[in-house]
A protein has these predicted regions:
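N-terminal secretory signal peptides that target proteins for export/translocation
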Residues: 1-2
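Sec-dependent N-terminal signal peptides
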Residues: 6-15
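Boundary at the C-terminal end of the N-terminal hydrophobic targeting segment
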Residues: 17-21
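Start-of-domain marker
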Residues: 22-52
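N-terminal post-signal-peptidase region of extra-cytosolic proteins
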Residues: 43-61, 73-76, 93-104, 109-116, ...
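Acidic helix-start/capping segments at beta-turn-to-alpha-helix junctions
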Residues: 65-68, 90-96, 190-196
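Short Gly/aromatic-enriched secondary-structure transition segments
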Residues: 77-92
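Exported/periplasmic cell-wall-interacting domains
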Residues: 105-254
Length: 255
């Protein structure tokens, strides 16, 4: 007889595998997703092979830079490997200004540490990936104000506080994210930075703002710590939120 713990483990693995397969099957039942997969599969697969990345893709990490209008897509095979840069997309529209989103209707793009929590295959903006805004930090920092919600990475170059890219690029990103989710990555991290902290021009723009706003300076230093760690190690740190809504970073246990 099999030990009870082994039986429970096998049942858990089978259930997880079925759920992942069901997610992909459900996504492919939507015409836009099925078409996007058909149009992008070969090119994405070739790029994976060239970079030594397993296909279907296993893990993703996204980071966006507001002032620089860029969205980077990083990929890796497992937790023990470093991420490699897979794609860089131009963010094709921007609303608001540098600084975090704190209240509904301010047209600000959030800044902070997020993850994808929604796949919308029937978006009015072609395809879209929802972010878990407001996160724990946003809720604390917003105080009694309504921080708003419904922040997406989406197609169609128009926005009132989201991250838009071209439709063809959105098709690629949506397919990659769906495959990673289907491979077991339930929480695809998305970090939104005010600037590229290693770009001199961007740093000078940010400094003018932070010189006049001590709270924003402290906030951007928290984000820069995360940026610097990833740039040095190509791995994600552990990030927590304290009772003041500040981000605290710890080195990755897989480092």
């Amino acid at each position: 007889m099999f030990p009870m713990k082994l039986i429970c483990f096998l049942i858990c693995c089978t259930t997880t595998s079925m759920a992942q397969s069901s997610f992909i099957k459900k996504q492919m039942s939507y015409p836009r997703v099925a078409t996007a997969y058909k149009l992008t599969k070969n090119q994405l697969k070739e790029q994976c092979v060239a970079l030594g990345i397993q296909w279907p893709i296993q893990q993703l990490y996204l980071r966006s830079f507001k002032y620089d209008s860029l969205l980077e897509v990083w990929a890796r095979n497992n937790n023990n490997e470093p991420f490699v840069l897979f794609k860089t997309y131009k963010v094709c529209a921007l609303s608001g200004s540098l600084g975090p989103k704190r209240v509904e209707g301010d047209y600000q793009v959030p800044e902070g540490i997020y993850y994808i929590n929604e796949f919308n295959p029937k978006s009015q903006f072609h395809l879209s990936l929802g972010l878990n805004y407001p996160n724990a930090a946003d809720k604390i920092k917003s105080g009694f104000q309504n921080p708003g919600n419904e922040i997406y990475i989406h197609g169609t170059c128009t926005t009132v506080g989201c991250i838009p890219i071209q439709n063809q690029q959105m098709e690629e990103l949506y397919v990659l994210a769906a495959l990673a989710n289907g491979a077991g990555q339930s929480f695809i991290p998305v970090h939104i930075f005010p600037i590229r902290f290693n770009n001199a021009k961007s740093k000078s723009v940010l400094q003018k703002l932070t010189d006049e706003d001590e709270h924003y300076k402290e906030f951007t230093l928290q984000l820069q710590t995360v940026f610097d760690y990833f740039d040095a190690n190509k791995k994600l740190p552990l990030i927590t939120v304290n009772n003041k809504g500040d981000y605290t970073m710890f080195p990755s246990p897989n480092q």
